[in-house]
Amino acid sequence: LTQRDLSVLKRKEELTQEQKDSIAAVQRIEEEAYETAKEEVDAALAYAPNNALFGSSSYRIPFPTGLWIYNALVGKKSRFAKWLFDTFAGTPVFISTVNPKTRALVAQNTLRNYGYFNGTVDYEILPEKNPKKAKISYTVRPRNLFRLDSIAYLRFPAVGDSLIRETFRQRTLFSGDPFSVINLDAERTRIYNMFRNSGYFYYKPEYITYRADTIQRPGFVQLQVVPADGIPASANKRYYLGRTTVNLFNNDSYELTDTLQFRDYTLYYDGGKKGKIPLRFGALRRNLFYRKGMLYRQDIMSFVQQQLSEMNVFSTVNLKYVPRDTTALNDTLDIEITGILDKPYDGEFTTKVTSKSNGQIGPGLSFSMSKRNAFRGAEKLKFEVHGSYEWQTNSTVQGHSSVINSYEYGTSLSLDYPRLIFPGARKFSRRAK
């Protein structure tokens, strides 16, 4: 609320529609923030007591049979007593186990994480008539909610500052919103991803910090987003992609005896006696959506990792980035791709029983054999043999000839190709240049 809004609260007849909307918006924001904080505080304080109902921290079963059995049979040695104890006894919940002091402290910190900086959480142990029993009472006082006032991004390098301004509409922090560490973490993650997608390979989330002032304007937070102190020089440098090395291992051999050079790519593989590459370079190259000299981008390289995994020819595949050299002037990362080819063959045997509405019932069998990377282009060739037999179990016509039994058998051959073959569609295959 502005000072003018506060001054007219007692004179409702003087409120304009704009002021009413402003007050309603603030109330709605505070109610939502309160419900969110309440849910988190309840979770921090919740602990199922003795004879809890379905694990509830508030509702209990009237008769604590679990505790009765525990008290009656604890320490008994007979086999039946041990079985009864293990099956039905309930472990007693002690005050020391609940640790109300720590829970109250956690709940109080939770309030502050959601903008209730003056909030407090106290607890009291309430003894009952039975000296062995007690209850815990928590008192939560959230008090006033702090909201964001000014938000400034300071001390970032010139390029980083320009990137922040270009993506300003994507921010998660807005003036007037309740203070929330969830939103702070979301903004830190957003800035981190922005830097990583703009060439800053060594940038980390912890390089982004916050400074907050709650004194200048009561009830509000003057927030500054600043880089952390002591950031290494490599984190403030943009990196470009260099040469690519591919280590292609067979599933039964970890030797690389052959080499293939193609422009900026070097492939090491085991060609065996025939010297053939186990996976054609073209099939691999189609999934490398980058080129030499391109600025490093985390989103594109993550997509490359995903596409290589989805080729379904590797048991494991990973990307490694190696600095061209260790000098301060270096700004190039070479890529090293290491993949281990999966076993070439898969077999599957399936049985089934079918029952139809026309009264036919019977078993079915199928066996399929698949070969990965069948033609060294990430294809999958599958051959299947199947058969089934069905009996008619009911017939409205008398006589042996009225019963109709049927059988089916056959084979199928399929080829899964990792790329659509369509004239003129080549330009669409490199969708992430």
Question: What residues fall within each predicted segment?
Answer:
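Interaction-mediating elements
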Residues: 1-310, 332
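Gram-negative/organellar outer-membrane beta-barrel architecture
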Residues: 163, 277, 297-433
